[in-house]
């Protein structure tokens, strides 16, 4: 059972800092829980975690992702979190972060704003109902019944849910300046900072997504994002050569986002795990370091001429 406080502050940043880092709000994955986030080392800032308030009763969200986002906005406001925040999460948590950020663009004078998105192995999403068959997920029978029911409820939503319609790239698609590993980089639009396994940061070119914005569409600019990408595919119990649903873009640096969505991911870090063991004990120290690297990028990221 999760704490009644929702969101719950799971880390507190240093009170001695002259300029306190932007707080981070992490959103649960499809399990509905936030236990994995409690296991992380210090992220050097205030960190909050939102669990699914429907978890204990296994109640599905009848209004889908839109209802969830609206409710979580109220939770963040009620917790007294104000001003600029970073928003993110593992897997489904990344999708919810993007949905919340999109909902905020339609609110006049919101009490908080999303200045960056942290995606932890959240691949580009296409509704399951529109995709060809894929390999089954691993056997989850060893997990508690409430967790398995939560997986089932979110699978139903993901079967038809589509990503919110952002119409403009992050930071107006301008060349940016940001810090990573204590160094400063200048990164042009259409390029990202990328850290492959066992290597340092590289400035690499990505595929471009062409979005013909209609004059009738509202200009909705994405927040910049940083991505943790699992480098391994999920082991399966079958002889199928098809990947699991979450591994459809495993071979791509940005997990399918660059060729299917307006440009918003500014940095990507590879981690030598698969989607379902990224938070296991032996991987936590490395993952914490990599998350801090991504947070450094998001803290420092700004268009040339503005920083």
Curated annotation (Swiss-Prot):
Disruption phenotype: Decreases significantly the production of KK-1. SUPFAM superfamilies: alpha/beta-Hydrolases. Disulfide bonds: none annotated. Pathway: Secondary metabolite biosynthesis. Induction: Expression is positively regulated by the KK-1 cluster-specific transcription factor kk1F. InterPro entries: AB_hydrolase_fold (IPR029058), Thioesterase (IPR001031). It holds the Pfam family Thioesterase. The keyword Transport does not apply. Keywords: Antibiotic biosynthesis, Hydrolase. GO terms for molecular function: hydrolase activity. One of its GO terms (biological process) is antibiotic biosynthetic process. Its EC number is 3.1.-.-. Probable thioesterase; part of the gene cluster that mediates the biosynthesis of KK-1, a novel cyclic depsipeptide with 10 residues which is a promising active compound with high activity against many plant pathogens, especially Botrytis cinerea. Within the pathway, kk1J is not essential for the biosynthesis of KK-1, but plays a role for efficient production via correction of peptide chain synthesis by kk1B. Belongs to the AMT4 thioesterase family. This is Probable thioesterase KK1J. The lineage of its organism: Eukaryota, Fungi, Dikarya, Ascomycota, Pezizomycotina.
């Amino acid at each position: 059972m999760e704490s009644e406080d929702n969101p719950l502050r799971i880390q507190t940043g240093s009170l001695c800092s002259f300029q306190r880092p932007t707080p981070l709000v992490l959103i649960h994955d499809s399990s509905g829980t936030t236990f994995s986030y409690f296991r992380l080392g210090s992220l050097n800032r205030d960190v909050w975690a939102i669990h699914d308030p429907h978890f204990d009763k296994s109640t599905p969200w009848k209004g889908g992702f839109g209802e969830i986002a609206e409710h979580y906005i109220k939770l963040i406001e009620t917790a007294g979190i104000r001003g600029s925040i970073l928003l993110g999460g593992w897997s489904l948590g990344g999708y919810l972060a993007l949905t919340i950020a999109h909902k905020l663009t339609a609110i006049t004078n919101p009490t908080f704003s999303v200045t960056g998105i942290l995606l932890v192995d959240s691949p580009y999403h296409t509704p399951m109902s529109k995709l060809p068959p894929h390999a089954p997920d691993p056997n989850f029978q060893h997990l508690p019944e409430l967790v398995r029911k939560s997986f089932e409820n979110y699978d139903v939503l993901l079967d038809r849910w589509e990503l919110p319609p952002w119409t403009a790239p992050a930071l107006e698609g301008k060349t940016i300046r940001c810090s990573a590993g204590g160094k400063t980089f200048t990164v042009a639009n259409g390029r990202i900072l990328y850290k492959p396994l066992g290597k340092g940061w590289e400035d690499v070119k990505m595929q471009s997504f062409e979005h013909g914005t209609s004059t009738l569409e509202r200009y909705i600019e994405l927040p910049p994002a940083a991505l943790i990408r699992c480098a391994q595919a999920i082991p399966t119990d079958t002889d199928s050569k098809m990947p699991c649903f979450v591994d459809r873009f495993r071979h791509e640096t940005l997990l399918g986002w660059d060729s299917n969505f307006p440009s918003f991911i500014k940095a990507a870090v590879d981690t030598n795990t698969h989607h379902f063991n990224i938070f296991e004990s032996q991987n936590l120290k490395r993952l914490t370091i990599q998350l801090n690297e991504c947070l450094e990028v998001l803290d420092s990221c700004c268009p040339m001429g503005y920083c």
